[in-house]
Amino acid sequence: MSEKTGTRFHNSIQTNGTLISKKWIRLFKSMKYDVGVSYDGLNNDLHRGKSTDTIRGFELCKKLKYPVGTISVITRENLNLRAQYEELKKYTKHMKFTPCFRTNSSNFAVEIEEYISQLKLLFEHWLLDSNTTVLHPIVYYIREVLGILETKECVHAACLGRMLDIDASGTIRICSHVADDAFILGQWGEYANISDIFNGEKFNSVVSMMIEKRINCKNSCRFFSFCQGGCCSETFLSQSGNVDFSCEVIRDFMPYVETRLREILSTSETLEAYNPKFIELVQEAVCKNPLRLKWLGNL
């Protein structure tokens, strides 16, 4: 925390893990860094490579009792989510699967129907697993249904005006997901202060686009409070004929999670057969939002 302003800082780093060493781990511990490793599991060599070095980094972190998380990009080649989950839980207790949605430059995008089908299979598999891994987006959706979701990812949190992407060359983008000129706001050296960045024509055109999108979503979708109209990059890409991937997933998967949780909480006298992390989430909901939980089950 800054003693001068009272501002809290949280440090994290995303890496492929290939150069993790004892020296780096000591530094991460001393600086209280959260470390995420980009690793695509069984198919890592297809798009990232150096899997042996990444696994060596995992094993070293495990030996020195330094927990790391993983982020895996889901493409057509690694769409067997249950197999990916089983592979990754050897190395981490906190994993996240991020589907590769269609962009102007991506040839690896998964089909929505296939991804949703795999996500449901993974959900059922995780529910009955004894492993305590925090699995996103599964846990993220469960927390929303239970009424205990407190923080949101940028794609569901109306991020415009709160975040910027600045690459190594100093190029400023509204979002790193889109390389289109409409999202490029110029170079860092062109601005006297950050507020000037948010007052430009390009930025405000994207804001106008999202205001219109959110008005439509709020009037037509019951999940608006969860997604806040979705991701600005996906909304922009959808104007070129691409499907709004996250929107379609939420509309299909969220009702599925609601139905399954209602079944579990209404019929199970005990939750002992379920994932310990799931039980922990239900217990948290009992404390924080018992009325929501009563709606889901006969409590």
PLM regions: where:
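Radical SAM/AdoMet-radical enzyme domain recognition
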Residues: 1-108
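Long, K/E/R/D-enriched contiguous segments that form extended
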Residues: 81-86, 90-152
